[in-house]
Amino acid sequence: MSLITVTNNNLEELKNKEVVVVEFWAPWCGYCKRLAPVLKTVAKDIDIMQVNIDDFEELSESYRVETIPALLVLRNGIASEPLI
């Protein structure tokens, strides 16, 4: 399993997976940097897709991400309430 950076090439994978954990983050976010080692450890067991909100602002807005870091579980593209 791994951390997967969302790009234009794999964006549809995010929406089409049955279940996926998604982290919304930004490189300038201090809390995101502090969470990174934890996610790296967790990603040994599950895939986590990472969305840089600066690169995918519309996607962040469509999932109503208001603060970062934000962790969501998507089931068939539908988001749960944020985990953090």
Describe the residue ranges of each PLM region:
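The canonical Cys-X-X-Cys-His
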Residues: C29-C32, L71
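Typically the conserved alpha-helix immediately C-terminal to a functionally engaged Cys/Sec
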Residues: Y31-D45
